[in-house]
């Protein structure tokens, strides 16, 4: 089944399968299924076309998903960088923006280690 341009896994429960759509987490998935009246424990393969269509409608009218959600997030980060606030500077320098320590951690954000050559020991005669 395809919703919002994403192929949902047929063998998973509806709640879990909906979280494969960017911009929909577990809480949003539960709310969507509750509004449509579908049991969250049902598998995606068990849903009929009418139920799938109603899920598509709810997502289209109430949620920002996939490309639109990614674009909005990129724009908000770009706005922070443009206004020059602290969080924007941290994004620009590829450092953690939420106050984490960086002396020993933050390898994911900083990337691979850039080796700096140490002092060479003087040869004693």
Swiss-Prot record:
Listed PROSITE patterns: RIBOSOMAL_S13_2
Pfam families linked: Ribosomal_S13
Record's compositionally biased regions (Basic residues): 107-125
A GO biological process held by the record: translation
Residue ranges, annotated region (Disordered): 92-125
Keywords attached to this entry: Ribonucleoprotein, Ribosomal protein, RNA-binding, rRNA-binding, tRNA-binding
Keyword Magnesium: no
Cellular component per GO, a single term: small ribosomal subunit
GO molecular function: rRNA binding; structural constituent of ribosome; tRNA binding
NCBIfam families, per the entry: uS13_bact (TIGR03631)
Family of the protein in this entry: Belongs to the universal ribosomal protein uS13 family.
Physiological role: Located at the top of the head of the 30S subunit, it contacts several helices of the 16S rRNA. In the 70S ribosome it contacts the 23S rRNA (bridge B1a) and protein L5 of the 50S subunit (bridge B1b), connecting the 2 subunits; these bridges are implicated in subunit movement. Contacts the tRNAs in the A and P-sites.
UniProt name for this protein: Small ribosomal subunit protein uS13
Gene source species: Chlorobium phaeobacteroides (strain BS1)
